[in-house]
Amino acid sequence: MLAAGLVGAAGAVAACSSTKARTGAAPAPTTTKVAVGPTTSTTCSPSAGQLGQIEHVVFVIQENRSFDHYFGTYRGVRGFDDHAANGNGVFAQPIPGAPSGAVLPFHLDTATTNAACTNDITHDWAPQHRAFNNGAMDGWATVHAAVDGADGGVTMGYYTRADLPYYYALADAFTICDAYHCSVIGPTDPNRMFSISATNDPAGLAGGPFINTVDPIPSAKLRFTMGWTTLPERLQNAGVSWKVYDNPAFATLVLAPGISNNKLYYFKRYADPTTELHQRAFGYGFPNDFVKDVQSGTLPSVSWVFASPGIDEHPPASPQRGEAFVSQVVATLLSNPAVWAKTAMFLTYDENGGFFDHVAPLVSPPGTPGEELTVSPLPSDAGGFARPIGLGFRVPMLVVSPFSRGGWVCSDRFDHTSMLRFVETRFGVEVPNLSAWRRSVTGDLTTTLDLSALDLSVPTLPVASDADPVVVRECPAHEVIQTVPHYPIPPNPAMLTQEAGTAKRHSTC
């Protein structure tokens, strides 16, 4: 075990500021319309004693949405105003057949079009690397047109506050991160493996490398076969309480064919149903067990809450059903003030789902240990790409806690391993498998909290319902077995701007 508080405080990239957080990333545009408002609060990496105020850490990881796709129009973030005044830059994506030769981001207007849900588009390892194009970020439209056909254009679609009122209200009330990345330039499974173990076994030493998602999910032939260490095992060995709350249909060993976002199913040490490790990984359901534990004051130190298919936001599942699910998690935490006062909830997305984001992620240099595939030959589905593994594209991250109240924007660079490092910093349980490079370029999420500013006021949040008549009419109940009509690219999308207003940011330490 590590001394609690030492690793994260030393490894944090910066306080939540708009300048330091971009060090080492793609060059900023010559000019930017993103305004930074006056500083009204100061925070640095908290001490171990301060962080001890957090007794419950809750991770909610939804599916397949990029930062620009959800929050590109949100005020003050690095979003759609992040381009030179005299051009559209990377926002104008080359595409054959377009009148101007390029396509701009366009609004998926849920009020007037059938945009409440759109079909799934490719987000596998090879197409994502082609969209990245060595950091040029100019392959989004061409790659998706080639792979996804009539559905490909939706890569450039985005939602606004009118479409996502609950999520925008959470950002207004708490803290949003605009430099949080998924871990892998690829799909669900490798990213979720990083979120629980900080690796996808690129050297193939323990069952990997895992670079794509295997259907059905998790694949029956790969269930309980992976041999590397996960964080829950470390927590178990250290005596730190933890649980996974999953879809009740998957909270048994039987696991009829279907889907779960709980990737602990892949790891061999969880196979024995008589062990506490297995029970904590697969024995608890959402919402019933989660509600019971919160209301009884027995919520463990670390929790993972996984949504079931249809409400996890994986296209064609609707964002609105995801909002309803997340609102249930938040409302449950708020229902017990004693638990809420000691809780930090982190809401993010496993990967971008093929949706456009304009910020080129920082990636490891060639030859970086643990950050490229070293098996030979490469997996057949690698498309010839051995590297980079990551960082991946930006995805949303909302930090919901009485210590994150106030509508802050945090621009420190994070990825999914930052969630593990938050646990490491708070509880002294070392993250397994984390590369030295990734530890050096990402923070541990402690700077998203101001532990000197406990705010127990309950924010006013809109009602989020999974019974919205538009969603019921347009969207399938199960995202995997159904599709929806193609969403066409509008004929003349115009470059948009962000919401008016400035960002509140914590000052640099």
Task: Kindly label every feature range from the protein language model.
Residues 1-17:
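N-terminal export signals
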